[in-house]
Every structure is written in structure tokens, then in C-alpha cells.
């Protein structure tokens, strides 16, 4: 099947990674997607519903490769027990950057599609931005008795009813971090908490489902 799609430059990613990349937005009103239209870009991304095998086949015929599967989940917000989390401060940024850099080294921004350190740098910047209230609105942390950070979660308000988890990590602290996220959403009057993770991250999927989440959708990321 032919693919109709617009091509949009990824301005922020291009500046951050130093690449010339774009993303295709598939829509029936757009022109046909052709190799000539894709040629000016060194990297082109596409995100499609995992159930849409027609688009998957068509994009692969245009030279796209499957990079990652994504699962989006949602759970109802309730007032969970207090986890003892506190709001991260700017003094926590160096430690958080180091933790996020190590925890998210194998995302869709990995080699060979991007530089070997690209994924680590991207998520280190993400968590710093969350502390500063840029993109994600806040970062909450759990501290060990020593004062070291043992877990963190970033969160963003989407609209009047929904909030979304950005990054969540902390060995053995998953249940507490989910309580933290639910309390944050509850305090802001939200009814739904959303979170996405890689299809292959079974530990995260189990944690979210154990916390009451249901799968809402699945998607594939493809690159050319």
C-alpha cells in the first residue's frame, strides 16, 4: 500500500544530537511518501500503531527499519499511601543526570542510529529539565538513609484530567515511585495517570500492571 505522509523536521533533536532528522506524520490528506522526499534527511523517524501491518510493510519497503516497540498504559488515580518522596532541587541535578544516563542507555536513540552516548545524554538532559520544570513539570525523589537518591520519577500534567510519567527508575523502588506518581496526580485533581515503556522492558510492564495499569495502545518506532 502507498503511504501518504507529511515530513516534519525534529528541530530540538537536531540541535541536541547534531543531526538532520525528521519525522513522518501519516495522514490520508498528505502527499505520497517517496524516496525522493526522504532523501534530504540523514535520519527519518516514523511511529505507527503496532496493529497497522499495512503501514509497517509499506514503510519497510521505503527503507525503514524497526527500532523499538512501545506500550502505552493508563491507570486510575487514587490517593496512595505516602512514599516519603520529596521534590528534587537543583543541587540534585548532577546525581540525577548520572543516574538517568546509566538507566536509559539503551533507548531508541542508541547506536547505530545515533552516537554511542546519545541516549545517555538525552535522558540526563530530560531529568535535568524535569527538575527545572521544563517539559515535565516536576521531579520527585526517594532518598536512602545515607541521603543518596535511590529512586526518581518525573511527571507532567497533560490536561485537566490526565498526567503522565516521564522517567521512572530506582532498583527495588518501583512500587514506592508509582505511589509517588499517583499521589502527585491526585493532589492536582487528575483521574488518569499515563505511562509508556519499551515492549521489551518486562520488569516495567509488570510493575505498572501490578500498580493497576491497563494497556491502552502499542506502537512501533521505525527509522530510515
From Swiss-Prot:
Enzymatic class: transferase
Domain of life: Bacteria
Enzyme active site: 208 (proton donor)
Function of the molecule: Catalyzes the acetylation of dTDP-fucosamine (dTDP-4-amino-4,6-dideoxy-D-galactose) to dTDP-Fuc4NAc, which is utilized in the biosynthesis of the enterobacterial common antigen (ECA).
Assembly: Homodimer.
Protein family (similarity comment): Belongs to the WecD family.
UniProt name for this protein: dTDP-fucosamine acetyltransferase
Organism in which the protein naturally occurs: Escherichia coli (strain K12)
Upper taxonomic lineage: Bacteria, Pseudomonadati, Pseudomonadota, Gammaproteobacteria, Enterobacterales
Amino acid at each position: 500500500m502507498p503511504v501518504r505522509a507529511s515530513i516534519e523536521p525534529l528541530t530540538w533533536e537536531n540541535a541536541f544530537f547534531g543531526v538532520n532528522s525528521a519525522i513522518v506524520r501519516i495522514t490520508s490528506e498528505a502527499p505520497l511518501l517517496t524516496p525522493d522526499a526522504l532523501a534530504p534527511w540523514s535520519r527519518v523517524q516514523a511511529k505507527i500503531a503496532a496493529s497497522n501491518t499495512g503501514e509497517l510493510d509499506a514503510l519497510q519497503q521505503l527503507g525503514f527499519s524497526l527500532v523499538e516497540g512501545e506500550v502505552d498504559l493508563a491507570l486510575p488515580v487514587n490517593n496512595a499511601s505516602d512514599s516519603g518522596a520529596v521534590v528534587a532541587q537543583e543541587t540534585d541535578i548532577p546525581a540525577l543526570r548520572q543516574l538517568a544516563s546509566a538507566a536509559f542507555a539503551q533507548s531508541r536513540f542508541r547506536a547505530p542510529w545515533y552516537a554511542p552516548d546519545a541516549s545517555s545524554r538525552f535522558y540526563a538532559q530530560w531529568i535535568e529539565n524535569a527538575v527545572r520544570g521544563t517539559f515535565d513539570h516536576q521531579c520527585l525523589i526517594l532518598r536512602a538513609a545515607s541521603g543518596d537518591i535511590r529512586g526518581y520519577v518525573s511527571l507532567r500534567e497533560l490536561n485537566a484530567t490526565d498526567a503522565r510519567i516521564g522517567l521512572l527508575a530506582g532498583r527495588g523502588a518501583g512500587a514506592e515511585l508509582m505511589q509517588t506518581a499517583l499521589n502527585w496526580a491526585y493532589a492536582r485533581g487528575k483521574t488518569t495517570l499515563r505511562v509508556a515503556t519499551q515492549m521489551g522492558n518486562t520488569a516495567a510492564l509488570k510493575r505498572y500492571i501490578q500498580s493497576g495499569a491497563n494497556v491502552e495502545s502499542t506502537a512501533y518506532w521505525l527509522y530510515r
